[in-house]
Amino acid sequence: IFWAGIIATFMFLYSITAYNVNNTKNKTVATVALPVNNKVIVIDAGHGVPDEGAQSSNGTTEAESNLKIALKVQNLLEQSGATVILTRSDENAIYDLDSNTLKQKKISDIHNRVKIGNESSADIFVSIHLNKIPQQQYWGWQTFYKQESPEGQKLATCIQNSLNQTIQKQNDRVPLKIDNVYIIKHVEIPISIVECGFLSNPEEEQLLLAD
């Protein structure tokens, strides 16, 4: 069921020509009329060795889970006729070889991700991440978009609503705008960060581990 929801979401991820966003008092509803055929989509699996990102109490790392999601989404999108550009395709971050310290590698890595997005001529950029907080009860997807980016807001709204309607019907979150994350500030095409759940929630961790 979990991966079926991802299939339904990303196979109808974005449409340039048939996209309506309707705002009500408390909800934003997006509808997409066309599939992803002939679209170019950057899928960014956040983090990567040596930066593992968040880690569950059982040792599941954000970097590993992000890549797993990215590869599955790549396969589904390509089967639907999209062209997918991955920022990374293995466990390693994409820092320059002359980076020595962890800080240098993380800075180089994020700069290279931005460069890939801005040189890709892609339609959209989707950055995949996972949450972790001390409390275990919190769960669910959350999407983010660049402040002052109407197209980014449309993208984030489409993803959030599709995920809510398909696999998390009790999730009432709406997309949030942020302006303090480097990648979302500097990627010039429509971009959304998708936090795909909580590694601190045991049930969501098991869903992420499932094939």
What does each of the following model-derived ranges do?
Residues I1-D211:
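Catalytic-site microenvironment of enzymes
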